[in-house]
Amino acid sequence: MTEIRNNWTKEEIAEIYHTPLLDLVYRAATVHRENKDYAEVQISSLISIKTGGCPEDCAYCPQAARYNTGVDVHGMLPKEEVIAAAEKAKAGGASRLCMGAAWREVRDNRDFDKVIDMVKAVNALDMEVCCTLGMLNEAQAQRLADAGLYAYNHNLDTSEDDYKRIITTRTYDDRLQTLEHVRKAKITVCSGGIIGLGETVEDRISMLKTLSNLPKHPESVPINALVPVKGTPLANQPSVSVWDMVRMIATTRIIMPKTVVRLSAGRTEMSTVEQAFCFMAGANSLFAGEKLLTTPNPSFDTDMAMFDLLGLTPRKAFKNGRPQQEIMETETIL
């Protein structure tokens, strides 16, 4: 087993990131096989339970109210629609449902009550439940935990130095504080970032340093490639190279060997061969289904065909226990 470290330096991470690509993939694949069943990949499904109208100014996001992106704004979905989506996702091979709401932060109101009911209902389907709802306080995190929430997603997006170029309506420390509240409630942490925002390689390395130097590594780190959306400030950003994705995934796998590395947004632009490189580099989770909130994504059928071709198997839910059980870091997976 690989040693778990929480004291990585930027210089060490940079040296890993800049390793010749094939050597980097080989090293990451070796670490992956030492710590995980390399052929086992968790399938997650992501749905938007409240879309658009967000007061924040995230430069990449089509759900920000201040941008004219043509997003179909809607309020909270009925619980019945969420259950139906969860059942469809489970039938397609997903073991986790992530519910996203376009909020700046959680508020103690009827909508949050509805989220609690949704968490309980999806949990009853024997699926892991994840939420991404913006900032939340300790009491709200505990309420979600009591309802059976397995994971909470709150991405850092980019480095602390680059952050204000992308978002001004909440601080980097706000994000880190939310992660602390999630951890204190014994909910597993999902936090990663986006490449292709116009950041530098140093920004990518700095973000990975922040994540890997948390008191406990996130159980899941999503690596997203920007999907430019017309109407947002980043609409004209050039597409990021798939090899940059491979480097990010491989570096993440090496410095956080027991963390699940999720191949997230941007897969529609990747061939099966390119995605295979991502799995070789240590990715062991993906989002399946036609949409990731508001952006396109490969279908369940397409992904199942890829799994068959590559010899991958979907991971079952709750392999390491239910949300409120103490999860061993040596076996934790999202």
Task: Write out the residue ranges for each language-model feature.
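Glycine- and other small-residue-rich loops at beta-strand/loop junctions that grip anionic moieties
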Residues: 47, 133, 171, 193-196, ...
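Conserved Radical SAM active-site core
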Residues: 65-192, 197-213
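Hydrophobic faces of well-ordered beta-strands that scaffold small-molecule active sites
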Residues: 41-45, 97, 129-131, 152-154, ...
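Mobile, glycine- and charge-enriched loop segments
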Residues: 39-55, 59-65, 116-123, 127-131, ...
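Residue-level signature of catalytic and energy-coupling elements of molecular machines
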Residues: 20, 58, 154
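N-terminal pre-triad scaffold of radical SAM enzymes
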Residues: 26-67, 74-100
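Glycine-rich, proline-tolerant flexible connector loops at the mouths of alpha/beta enzymes
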Residues: 42-48, 68-71, 98-111, 162-163, ...
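Auxiliary Fe-S-binding modules of radical SAM enzymes
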Residues: 1-39, 84, 212-334
